[in-house]
Amino acid sequence: MHAPGALFYVGDPHHAMGDGEVALTAMEGSLRGTFRLTVCKEGEGDAPRLAHRYPFAETADAWIPIGLSDPDGSVDGQGSDLDVALRTAVVNALEFLEQELGMDRAIAYAYLSAAADFTISQVVDRTVGVHGIIAKSHFA
């Protein structure tokens, strides 16, 4: 199913995969799932504003800003695709901390540097990804 602006994709399940998926494969597996999707309009519900423009995940324990590179490679000399993905994840994390938690940008930057974890999601496809982990316990 394709819907413009849906920002939802599921597939390519892995039973095991190291951080970064570097060799085009992992412990592949089958997937059977039931999903219930709810349309969340901007300004309504609990979804952060950022999630309406860019992939963003949330678990019971963490907020997860995501950064992806351009599948066609670097643009305007911005550096490697991984650099672009990391920069995008950090910018998305900053926006989340400022807009949703009311944090000053300079404090948010310092927090991300000192306490958040940024991990390579995968580098095997044309689009590479980085995701951040912002622990909710830091804000309890």
Which ranges hold each PLM region?
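A hydrophobic, small-residue-rich beta->alpha segment in the mid-to-C-terminal subdomain
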Residues: L50-A106, Y111
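Glycine-rich anion/phosphate-binding loop at the beta-strand->alpha-helix junction
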Residues: M1-R53, V91, R105-A106, Y111-G129, ...
